[in-house]
């Protein structure tokens, strides 16, 4: 399940603020079939996305979005978005006040503790008619600490696929990418990263 609470507001004509006060994600696989288990064994990337996870996070996102030139045609557009997210500190504080030591769990699942920041800039320039030249820069970093040795799989970064470089398969380039020297390598290397 997933539940959250936050506020969105415009601080000016070109700027938007999003304050996510609390978001809770809980993933727990209750029962599986033999066919499902076989599929998970054959594809570790999919199996990672089904791991039990408890993520309690909060964050803030600032967006600047401005159209330059003729607004109707959106000749030029610049969008810059920066965000910071923290996970697990509220629960860690409660557990510390209660005197809990070791791995802290909620509903039998360890909760994640991490901090993550991202910065994205997109520039669009109308060349002729509906044709545009678009450039995008995205950078992000995340760090796990406290109750976690790594950030949750769903919070990690990857490159490729429909929302990134469409000419490349998802997770085939960028952070954590790996290309075996052997054509039929039986090893699997997870291809996500914290930067």
Residue ranges with predicted function:
Residues 4, 14-195:
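C-terminal outer-membrane beta-barrel translocator/porin domains of Gram-negative envelope proteins
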Residues 1:
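A surface-exposed, charged beta-strand/loop segment in the N-terminal or early-internal portion
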């Amino acid at each position: 399940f997933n539940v959250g609470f936050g506020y969105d507001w415009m601080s000016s004509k070109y700027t938007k603020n999003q304050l996510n006060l609390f978001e809770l994600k809980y993933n727990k696989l209750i029962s599986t079939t033999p066919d499902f288990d076989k599929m998970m064994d054959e594809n570790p990337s999919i199996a990672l996305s089904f791991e039990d996870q408890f993520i309690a996070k909060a964050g803030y996102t600032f967006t600047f979005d401005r159209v330059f030139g003729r607004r109707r045609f959106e000749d030029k557009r610049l969008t810059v978005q920066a965000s910071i997210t923290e996970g697990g500190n509220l629960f860690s504080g409660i557990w510390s006040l209660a005197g809990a030591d070791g791995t802290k769990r909620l509903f039998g699942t360890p909760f994640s503790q991490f901090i993550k920041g991202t910065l994205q800039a997109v520039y669009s320039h109308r060349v002729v008619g509906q044709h545009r030249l678009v450039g995008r820069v995205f950078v992000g970093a995340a760090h796990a600490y406290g109750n976690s040795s790594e950030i949750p799989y769903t919070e990690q970064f990857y490159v490729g696929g429909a929302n990134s470089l469409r000419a490349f398969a998802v997770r085939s380039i960028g952070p954590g990418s790996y290309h075996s020297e052997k054509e039929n390598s039986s090893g699997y290397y997870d291809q996500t990263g914290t930067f």
